[in-house]
């Protein structure tokens, strides 16, 4: 008989929390009891879980001793406060915030890239889910680095407003609507107007000129792939509701061309390659909404530099960029360790 688990999704009313519930139901995760958990402000709300409707329960009242696996999707402050309580009660935690990602003794996992480090979860009973851009990048870069060592990557991201939560999506919607009725909506969630606009500012601005988002992506990729990887990132917020896109220039340590890179990625787990021979041989963010794969297109040689190629990555940031990755981690946990 298959063992079943008591599961809690913390932050269940948010974009990623809701998607986590959807994916757990879609993939028939072996669940005995499911808890949809949020702050006291969400008490009385309901969320979907497959064909069920779940009542939101309060995080303050949650007894972690009854929970086998907790998915934290409520931000760093909640993780900082409640995860230490959870692990004392022997609850296994998969954290989607940035709080623990760079801790040396906590694994930062992308199953297609570094599953061998999952065993380290036992040190603290915590596994970190990477940044929504670091995940698809790791899915693509790790198999390439395994075959032909990567020297350097230059990354420009085009990140949808859902990365800033439901409030970010609402702000884009409201500003877009207001433009058609000649009203002005001041920015609240974002630093500048997001409707019909874009800006290279996600997270806080650091003293070195990079944003906190750009620093996270670089440091997380190095933790997942290796310190030998040199990374430069520019992160851009774009007026798209769901779906992140990434332009990547990859410089390899030895001779390689676009055809060889395409052949490697065609065999890579979690990747869908769009051949350059097709008409409209690229994928846009609206085409990947609801999809689990990381899509790669527009692979081409960099004619300005030897041993370098350019490519375009697109994925659903709420699924593989967040919720799906965490559920895949849980599936591997129960398959191998629990």
Swiss-Prot record:
The keyword Amino-acid biosynthesis applies. Keywords: Amino-acid biosynthesis, Diaminopimelate biosynthesis, Lysine biosynthesis, Methionine biosynthesis, NADP, Oxidoreductase, Threonine biosynthesis. Pathway: Amino-acid biosynthesis; L-lysine biosynthesis via DAP pathway; (S)-tetrahydrodipicolinate from L-aspartate: step 2/4; Amino-acid biosynthesis; L-methionine biosynthesis via de novo pathway; L-homoserine from L-aspartate: step 2/3; Amino-acid biosynthesis; L-threonine biosynthesis; L-threonine from L-aspartate: step 2/5. It catalyses: L-aspartate 4-semialdehyde + phosphate + NADP(+) = 4-phospho-L-aspartate + NADPH + H(+). CDD domains: ASADH_C_bac_euk_like, VcASADH2_like_N. One of its GO terms (biological process) is threonine biosynthetic process. One of its GO terms (molecular function) is NADP binding. NADP(+) binds at residues 13-16, 41-42, 162-163, 317. InterPro entries: Asp_semialdehyde_DH, Asp_semialdehyde_DH_beta, NAD(P)-bd_dom_sf, Semialdehyde_DH_NAD-bd, Semialdhyde_DH_dimer_dom. It is an enzyme of class 1 (oxidoreductase). HAMAP family: ASADH (MF_02121). This is Aspartate-semialdehyde dehydrogenase. The gene is asd.
């Amino acid at each position: 008989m298959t063992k079943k688990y008591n599961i809690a999704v913390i932050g269940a009313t948010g974009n990623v929390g809701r998607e986590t519930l959807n994916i757990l139901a879609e993939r028939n995760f072996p669940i005995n009891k499911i808890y949809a958990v949020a702050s006291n402000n969400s008490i009385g709300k309901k969320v979907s879980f497959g064909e069920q409707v779940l009542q939101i329960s309060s995080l303050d009242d949650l007894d972690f001793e009854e929970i086998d696996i907790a998915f934290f999707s409520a931000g760093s402050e909640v993780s900082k406060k409640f995860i230490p309580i959870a692990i004392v009660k022997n609850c296994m935690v998969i954290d989607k915030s940035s709080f623990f990602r760079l801790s040396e003794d906590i694994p930062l996992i992308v199953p297609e890239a570094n599953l061998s480090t999952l065993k380290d979860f036992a040190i603290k009973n915590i596994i970190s889910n990477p940044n929504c851009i670091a995940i698809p990048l790791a899915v693509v870069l790790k198999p390439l680095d395994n075959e032909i060592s990567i020297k350097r990557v230059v990354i420009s991201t085009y990140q949808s407003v859902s990365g800033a939560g439901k409030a970010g999506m609402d702000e884009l919607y409201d500003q877009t609507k207001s433009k058609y009725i000649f009203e002005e909506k001041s920015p609240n969630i974002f630093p500048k107007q997001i409707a019909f606009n874009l800006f290279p500012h996600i997270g806080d601005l650091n003293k070195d000129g990079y944003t906190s988002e750009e620093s996270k992506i670089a440091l997380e990729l190095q933790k997942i792939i290796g310190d030998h990887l040199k990374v430069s990132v520019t992160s851009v917020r774009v007026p798209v509701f769901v779906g992140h896109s990434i332009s990547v220039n990859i410089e390899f340590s030895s001779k390689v061309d676009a055809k060889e890179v395409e052949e490697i990625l065609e065999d890579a787990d979690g990747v869908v390659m769009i051949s350059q021979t097709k008409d409209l041989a690229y994928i846009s963010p609206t085409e990947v909404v609801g999809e689990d794969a990381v899509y790669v297109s527009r692979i081409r040689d960099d004619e300005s530099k030897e041993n370098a190629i350019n490519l375009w990555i697109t994925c659903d940031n709420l699924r593989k960029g967040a919720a799906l990755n965490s559920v895949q981690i849980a599936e591997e946990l129960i398959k191998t360790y629990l």
